[in-house]
Protein backbone atom coordinates (compact mmCIF):
# COMPACT_ATOMS: atom_id res chain seq x y z
CA UNK A 1 0.00 0.00 0.00
CA UNK A 2 1.27 3.46 -0.92
CA UNK A 3 -0.33 6.64 0.31
CA UNK A 4 0.12 10.36 -0.11
CA UNK A 5 0.39 12.61 2.92
CA UNK A 6 0.50 16.35 3.34
CA UNK A 7 3.74 18.08 4.35
CA UNK A 8 2.21 18.63 7.80
CA UNK A 9 1.42 14.93 8.19
CA UNK A 10 4.89 13.96 7.04
CA UNK A 11 6.41 16.38 9.54
CA UNK A 12 4.31 14.85 12.33
CA UNK A 13 5.40 11.33 11.41
CA UNK A 14 9.04 12.39 11.21
CA UNK A 15 8.95 14.15 14.57
CA UNK A 16 7.29 11.13 16.16
CA UNK A 17 9.75 8.62 14.73
CA UNK A 18 12.82 10.70 15.56
CA UNK A 19 11.47 11.65 18.99
CA UNK A 20 11.91 15.35 18.32
CA UNK A 21 9.85 16.32 21.41
CA UNK A 22 12.08 14.05 23.51
CA UNK A 23 9.30 12.14 25.26
CA UNK A 24 7.62 10.02 22.58
CA UNK A 25 6.91 6.47 23.82
CA UNK A 26 8.72 3.76 21.91
CA UNK A 27 5.54 2.07 20.71
CA UNK A 28 4.36 5.33 19.10
CA UNK A 29 7.68 5.68 17.33
CA UNK A 30 7.28 2.14 16.01
CA UNK A 31 3.82 2.90 14.70
CA UNK A 32 5.06 6.08 13.02
CA UNK A 33 7.77 4.00 11.38
CA UNK A 34 5.30 1.60 9.82
CA UNK A 35 3.04 4.43 8.76
CA UNK A 36 6.04 5.95 6.98
CA UNK A 37 6.69 2.56 5.39
CA UNK A 38 3.18 2.71 3.92
CA UNK A 39 3.96 6.14 2.47
CA UNK A 40 7.31 5.13 0.94
CA UNK A 41 9.51 7.20 -1.35
CA UNK A 42 12.90 8.87 -1.13
CA UNK A 43 11.93 11.26 1.67
CA UNK A 44 10.86 8.35 3.84
CA UNK A 45 14.14 6.56 3.16
CA UNK A 46 15.99 9.67 4.33
CA UNK A 47 13.87 10.02 7.48
CA UNK A 48 14.23 6.37 8.42
CA UNK A 49 17.97 6.50 7.74
CA UNK A 50 18.28 9.49 10.06
CA UNK A 51 16.71 7.43 12.81
CA UNK A 52 19.66 5.04 12.76
CA UNK A 53 21.49 7.54 14.98
CA UNK A 54 19.15 6.57 17.83
CA UNK A 55 20.70 4.72 20.78
CA UNK A 56 18.00 2.01 20.90
CA UNK A 57 19.18 -1.21 19.19
CA UNK A 58 15.57 -2.39 19.02
CA UNK A 59 14.45 0.68 17.11
CA UNK A 60 17.51 0.69 14.84
CA UNK A 61 16.94 -2.97 14.02
CA UNK A 62 13.36 -2.16 13.01
CA UNK A 63 14.50 0.85 10.98
CA UNK A 64 16.88 -1.35 8.99
CA UNK A 65 14.09 -3.87 8.43
CA UNK A 66 11.82 -1.17 7.00
CA UNK A 67 14.57 0.15 4.73
CA UNK A 68 14.75 -3.31 3.20
CA UNK A 69 11.00 -3.63 2.82
CA UNK A 70 10.83 -0.29 0.98
CA UNK A 71 12.83 -1.83 -1.91
CA UNK A 72 14.46 1.52 -2.63
CA UNK A 73 18.09 1.45 -3.76
CA UNK A 74 18.53 4.89 -2.19
CA UNK A 75 18.91 2.99 1.10
CA UNK A 76 21.85 0.86 -0.07
CA UNK A 77 24.68 3.18 1.08
CA UNK A 78 23.11 3.58 4.53
CA UNK A 79 22.54 -0.14 4.97
CA UNK A 80 26.06 -0.93 3.77
CA UNK A 81 27.54 1.48 6.32
CA UNK A 82 25.51 -0.11 9.11
CA UNK A 83 26.75 -3.56 8.10
CA UNK A 84 30.36 -2.34 7.89
CA UNK A 85 29.95 -0.56 11.23
CA UNK A 86 33.19 1.45 11.04
CA UNK A 87 32.51 3.37 14.27
CA UNK A 88 31.34 0.35 16.25
CA UNK A 89 28.00 1.96 17.14
CA UNK A 90 25.78 -0.86 15.86
CA UNK A 91 25.33 -4.17 17.65
CA UNK A 92 25.14 -7.48 15.80
CA UNK A 93 21.32 -7.46 15.85
CA UNK A 94 21.26 -4.18 13.91
CA UNK A 95 24.04 -5.23 11.54
CA UNK A 96 22.26 -8.50 10.83
CA UNK A 97 19.09 -6.60 9.94
CA UNK A 98 21.03 -4.31 7.62
CA UNK A 99 22.44 -7.33 5.80
CA UNK A 100 18.98 -8.86 5.53
CA UNK A 101 17.66 -5.56 4.18
CA UNK A 102 20.33 -5.55 1.48
CA UNK A 103 19.13 -9.01 0.52
CA UNK A 104 15.52 -7.81 0.47
CA UNK A 105 16.32 -4.96 -1.92
CA UNK A 106 18.15 -7.52 -4.02
CA UNK A 107 20.60 -5.30 -5.89
CA UNK A 108 23.47 -7.15 -7.56
CA UNK A 109 25.82 -4.37 -6.45
CA UNK A 110 25.34 -5.50 -2.83
CA UNK A 111 26.88 -8.93 -3.44
CA UNK A 112 30.54 -7.91 -2.83
CA UNK A 113 29.92 -6.42 0.61
CA UNK A 114 27.65 -9.29 1.62
CA UNK A 115 30.26 -11.84 0.52
CA UNK A 116 32.90 -9.93 2.46
CA UNK A 117 30.93 -10.09 5.69
CA UNK A 118 30.18 -13.79 5.28
CA UNK A 119 33.53 -13.95 7.11
CA UNK A 120 32.45 -11.65 9.96
CA UNK A 121 33.39 -12.64 13.49
CA UNK A 122 29.73 -12.55 14.56
CA UNK A 123 27.76 -15.68 13.68
CA UNK A 124 24.41 -13.94 13.17
CA UNK A 125 25.99 -11.45 10.76
CA UNK A 126 27.84 -14.20 8.87
CA UNK A 127 24.73 -16.31 8.50
CA UNK A 128 22.55 -13.40 7.44
CA UNK A 129 25.03 -12.43 4.74
CA UNK A 130 25.10 -16.04 3.52
CA UNK A 131 21.31 -16.08 3.21
CA UNK A 132 21.20 -12.63 1.60
CA UNK A 133 23.73 -13.71 -1.04
CA UNK A 134 21.64 -16.81 -1.69
CA UNK A 135 18.51 -14.71 -2.11
CA UNK A 136 20.07 -12.20 -4.51
CA UNK A 137 21.64 -14.96 -6.60
CA UNK A 138 18.30 -16.77 -6.70
CA UNK A 139 16.44 -13.59 -7.66
CA UNK A 140 18.86 -13.05 -10.54
CA UNK A 141 18.54 -16.63 -11.79
CA UNK A 142 16.07 -17.83 -14.41
CA UNK A 143 14.21 -19.80 -11.75
CA UNK A 144 14.03 -16.75 -9.52
CA UNK A 145 12.67 -14.56 -12.28
CA UNK A 146 9.82 -17.03 -12.76
CA UNK A 147 9.04 -17.36 -9.05
CA UNK A 148 6.16 -15.36 -7.61
CA UNK A 149 5.93 -14.47 -3.93
CA UNK A 150 3.00 -15.77 -1.91
CA UNK A 151 0.39 -12.98 -2.11
CA UNK A 152 -0.99 -14.03 1.27
CA UNK A 153 2.17 -12.70 2.96
CA UNK A 154 2.90 -9.10 1.86
CA UNK A 155 6.52 -9.03 3.00
CA UNK A 156 9.88 -9.36 1.29
CA UNK A 157 11.16 -12.57 2.83
CA UNK A 158 14.84 -13.48 3.37
CA UNK A 159 14.29 -16.52 1.15
CA UNK A 160 11.55 -17.61 -1.25
CA UNK A 161 9.35 -20.48 -0.18
CA UNK A 162 10.43 -23.91 -1.36
CA UNK A 163 8.30 -25.70 -3.92
CA UNK A 164 5.08 -27.04 -2.40
CA UNK A 165 5.63 -30.34 -0.61
CA UNK A 166 4.28 -32.30 2.32
CA UNK A 167 4.93 -31.14 5.87
CA UNK A 168 7.17 -34.07 6.93
CA UNK A 169 9.49 -33.49 3.96
CA UNK A 170 9.69 -29.76 4.61
CA UNK A 171 10.26 -30.38 8.31
CA UNK A 172 13.14 -32.71 7.43
CA UNK A 173 14.77 -30.00 5.31
CA UNK A 174 14.12 -27.37 7.99
CA UNK A 175 15.97 -29.39 10.62
CA UNK A 176 18.75 -30.74 8.38
CA UNK A 177 21.84 -28.83 9.50
CA UNK A 178 23.89 -30.30 6.64
CA UNK A 179 21.86 -28.25 4.15
CA UNK A 180 22.74 -24.63 3.31
CA UNK A 181 20.90 -22.12 5.47
CA UNK A 182 19.25 -20.63 2.41
CA UNK A 183 17.68 -23.98 1.57
CA UNK A 184 16.53 -24.50 5.15
CA UNK A 185 14.98 -21.03 5.14
CA UNK A 186 13.10 -21.92 1.98
CA UNK A 187 11.62 -24.91 3.79
CA UNK A 188 10.78 -22.64 6.73
CA UNK A 189 8.78 -20.25 4.59
CA UNK A 190 7.07 -23.10 2.75
CA UNK A 191 5.87 -24.40 6.12
CA UNK A 192 4.62 -20.91 6.93
CA UNK A 193 2.57 -20.96 3.75
CA UNK A 194 0.38 -23.73 5.17
CA UNK A 195 -1.18 -20.98 7.30
CA UNK A 196 -2.15 -20.41 10.90
CA UNK A 197 -4.70 -23.21 10.95
CA UNK A 198 -2.19 -25.98 10.32
CA UNK A 199 -1.17 -27.28 13.73
CA UNK A 200 1.19 -29.77 12.09
CA UNK A 201 3.06 -27.03 10.21
CA UNK A 202 3.27 -24.80 13.30
CA UNK A 203 4.62 -27.69 15.37
CA UNK A 204 7.17 -28.48 12.66
CA UNK A 205 8.34 -24.87 12.75
CA UNK A 206 8.47 -24.92 16.55
CA UNK A 207 10.84 -27.88 16.36
CA UNK A 208 13.28 -25.45 14.77
CA UNK A 209 13.61 -23.67 18.10
CA UNK A 210 16.03 -26.45 19.05
CA UNK A 211 18.48 -25.32 16.37
CA UNK A 212 21.87 -24.02 17.44
CA UNK A 213 21.59 -20.83 15.37
CA UNK A 214 20.02 -17.83 17.11
CA UNK A 215 19.37 -16.32 13.69
CA UNK A 216 17.41 -19.40 12.66
CA UNK A 217 15.40 -19.41 15.89
CA UNK A 218 14.61 -15.71 15.62
CA UNK A 219 13.25 -16.16 12.09
CA UNK A 220 10.86 -18.85 13.31
CA UNK A 221 9.59 -16.48 16.00
CA UNK A 222 9.12 -13.78 13.35
CA UNK A 223 7.12 -16.18 11.19
CA UNK A 224 4.93 -17.05 14.16
CA UNK A 225 4.20 -13.34 14.45
CA UNK A 226 3.07 -13.34 10.83
CA UNK A 227 0.91 -16.42 11.27
CA UNK A 228 -0.71 -15.32 14.54
CA UNK A 229 -1.52 -18.95 15.26
CA UNK A 230 -2.60 -19.83 18.80
CA UNK A 231 -0.74 -23.12 18.36
CA UNK A 232 2.57 -21.23 18.52
CA UNK A 233 1.95 -19.55 21.87
CA UNK A 234 3.51 -22.20 24.18
CA UNK A 235 6.78 -22.29 22.24
CA UNK A 236 6.95 -18.50 22.00
CA UNK A 237 6.40 -18.13 25.73
CA UNK A 238 9.15 -20.64 26.34
CA UNK A 239 11.59 -18.59 24.23
CA UNK A 240 10.65 -15.29 25.85
CA UNK A 241 10.99 -16.57 29.40
CA UNK A 242 14.28 -18.40 28.85
CA UNK A 243 16.98 -16.15 30.29
CA UNK A 244 19.62 -18.18 28.43
CA UNK A 245 18.00 -17.54 25.05
CA UNK A 246 19.57 -14.98 22.72
CA UNK A 247 18.07 -11.49 23.00
CA UNK A 248 17.14 -11.33 19.31
CA UNK A 249 15.07 -14.50 19.66
CA UNK A 250 13.35 -13.28 22.81
CA UNK A 251 12.63 -9.95 21.13
CA UNK A 252 10.90 -11.63 18.19
CA UNK A 253 9.00 -13.95 20.52
CA UNK A 254 7.69 -11.01 22.54
CA UNK A 255 6.49 -9.10 19.50
CA UNK A 256 4.92 -12.22 18.03
CA UNK A 257 2.97 -12.76 21.24
CA UNK A 258 1.83 -9.14 21.19
CA UNK A 259 0.60 -9.50 17.63
CA UNK A 260 -1.19 -12.80 18.27
CA UNK A 261 -2.97 -11.09 21.17
CA UNK A 262 -4.55 -14.29 22.42
CA UNK A 263 -4.15 -16.74 25.27
CA UNK A 264 -4.21 -19.58 22.80
CA UNK A 265 -6.17 -22.66 21.92
CA UNK A 266 -7.28 -23.43 25.45
CA UNK A 267 -8.86 -19.99 25.98
CA UNK A 268 -10.57 -20.02 22.59
CA UNK A 269 -11.76 -23.62 22.94
CA UNK A 270 -12.51 -24.38 26.61
CA UNK A 271 -12.96 -28.07 25.85
CA UNK A 272 -9.29 -28.30 24.90
CA UNK A 273 -7.08 -29.25 27.85
CA UNK A 274 -3.40 -28.59 27.30
CA UNK A 275 -0.55 -30.57 28.84
CA UNK A 276 0.72 -29.14 32.11
CA UNK A 277 3.89 -27.71 30.56
CA UNK A 278 1.88 -25.78 27.94
CA UNK A 279 -0.63 -24.15 30.26
CA UNK A 280 -0.51 -20.41 30.75
CA UNK A 281 0.33 -18.74 34.05
CA UNK A 282 -2.36 -16.82 35.88
CA UNK A 283 -3.20 -13.67 33.94
CA UNK A 284 -2.26 -15.24 30.60
CA UNK A 285 0.14 -14.00 27.95
CA UNK A 286 -0.46 -10.33 28.68
CA UNK A 287 0.62 -10.84 32.28
CA UNK A 288 3.89 -12.38 31.07
CA UNK A 289 4.51 -9.45 28.72
CA UNK A 290 3.79 -6.96 31.49
CA UNK A 291 6.14 -8.80 33.82
CA UNK A 292 9.06 -8.66 31.40
CA UNK A 293 8.29 -5.09 30.32
CA UNK A 294 9.32 -3.83 33.75
CA UNK A 295 11.77 -6.52 34.84
CA UNK A 296 14.81 -4.63 36.06
CA UNK A 297 17.26 -7.41 35.21
CA UNK A 298 15.82 -8.12 31.75
CA UNK A 299 17.99 -7.14 28.77
CA UNK A 300 16.96 -3.76 27.38
CA UNK A 301 15.97 -5.24 24.02
CA UNK A 302 13.70 -7.78 25.71
CA UNK A 303 12.14 -5.21 28.02
CA UNK A 304 11.49 -2.73 25.20
CA UNK A 305 10.10 -5.48 22.96
CA UNK A 306 7.60 -6.40 25.64
CA UNK A 307 6.57 -2.75 25.99
CA UNK A 308 5.93 -2.60 22.24
CA UNK A 309 4.17 -5.98 22.37
CA UNK A 310 1.77 -4.75 25.04
CA UNK A 311 0.76 -1.89 22.76
CA UNK A 312 0.27 -4.36 19.92
CA UNK A 313 -1.87 -6.58 22.15
CA UNK A 314 -4.01 -3.65 23.23
CA UNK A 315 -4.41 -2.56 19.62
CA UNK A 316 -5.48 -6.02 18.46
CA UNK A 317 -8.07 -6.19 21.24
CA UNK A 318 -9.29 -2.60 20.85
CA UNK A 319 -12.86 -2.04 19.73
CA UNK A 320 -11.90 0.95 17.61
CA UNK A 321 -8.30 -0.03 16.69
CA UNK A 322 -7.00 3.42 17.53
CA UNK A 323 -4.45 5.60 15.82
CA UNK A 324 -2.30 7.42 18.41
CA UNK A 325 -1.49 10.19 15.92
CA UNK A 326 -5.01 11.56 16.09
CA UNK A 327 -4.42 14.42 13.67
CA UNK A 328 -3.72 11.93 10.90
CA UNK A 329 -7.09 10.20 11.20
CA UNK A 330 -9.30 13.27 11.45
CA UNK A 331 -10.51 12.82 7.87
CA UNK A 332 -12.50 9.76 8.82
CA UNK A 333 -14.18 9.51 12.22
CA UNK A 334 -15.46 5.97 11.82
CA UNK A 335 -13.71 3.13 10.08
CA UNK A 336 -14.58 -0.53 9.88
CA UNK A 337 -12.20 -2.70 11.82
CA UNK A 338 -9.31 -3.65 9.60
CA UNK A 339 -9.08 -7.34 8.82
CA UNK A 340 -6.10 -9.16 10.27
CA UNK A 341 -3.65 -9.96 7.51
CA UNK A 342 -0.42 -11.93 7.55
CA UNK A 343 1.85 -9.17 8.77
CA UNK A 344 3.25 -8.44 12.20
CA UNK A 345 0.93 -6.88 14.76
CA UNK A 346 2.68 -3.52 14.73
CA UNK A 347 2.39 -3.31 10.96
CA UNK A 348 -1.29 -4.21 11.13
CA UNK A 349 -1.95 -1.33 13.50
CA UNK A 350 -0.06 1.06 11.24
CA UNK A 351 -2.01 -0.16 8.21
CA UNK A 352 -5.25 0.60 10.02
CA UNK A 353 -4.05 4.08 10.87
CA UNK A 354 -3.05 4.72 7.28
CA UNK A 355 -6.42 3.43 6.08
CA UNK A 356 -8.07 5.85 8.48
CA UNK A 357 -6.47 8.73 6.58
CA UNK A 358 -8.80 7.89 3.71
CA UNK A 359 -6.13 8.86 1.17
CA UNK A 360 -4.82 5.57 -0.16
CA UNK A 361 -3.28 6.16 -3.56
Curated annotation (Swiss-Prot):
Tell me its cofactors: Fe(2+)
Q: Which GO terms describe its cellular component?
A: cytoplasm; nucleus
Name the chemical reaction catalysed here. [eIF5A protein]-deoxyhypusine + AH2 + O2 = [eIF5A protein]-hypusine + A + H2O
Keywords on record: Cytoplasm, Hypusine biosynthesis, Iron, Metal-binding, Monooxygenase, Nucleus, Oxidoreductase, Repeat
Give the cofactor note text. Binds 2 Fe(2+) ions per subunit.
Signal peptide per UniProt? none
Tagged with keyword Iron: yes
- Kindly list the positions annotated as binding Fe cation 2: 218-219, 251-252
Family per UniProt?
Belongs to the deoxyhypusine hydroxylase family.
Q: In which pathway does it act?
A: Protein modification; eIF5A hypusination
EC number of the protein: 1.14.99.29
- Molecular function terms in GO for this entry? deoxyhypusine monooxygenase activity; metal ion binding
What subcellular compartments does it reside in? Cytoplasm; Nucleus
Positions annotated to bind Fe cation 1: 61-62, 96-97
Quote the InterPro entries the UniProt record gives. ARM-like, ARM-type_fold, Deoxyhypusine_hydroxylase, PBS_lyase_HEAT
* Keyword check for Oxidoreductase: yes
Q: Which PANTHER family match?
A: DEOXYHYPUSINE HYDROXYLASE, PBS LYASE HEAT-LIKE PROTEIN
The UniProt entry, under SUPFAM superfamilies, shows: ARM repeat
Chain positions of HEAT-like PBS-type repeats: 59-85, 94-120, 183-211, 216-242
Q: What is this protein called?
A: Deoxyhypusine hydroxylase
What functional role does this protein have?
Answer: Catalyzes the hydroxylation of the N(6)-(4-aminobutyl)-L-lysine intermediate to form hypusine, an essential post-translational modification only found in mature eIF-5A factor.
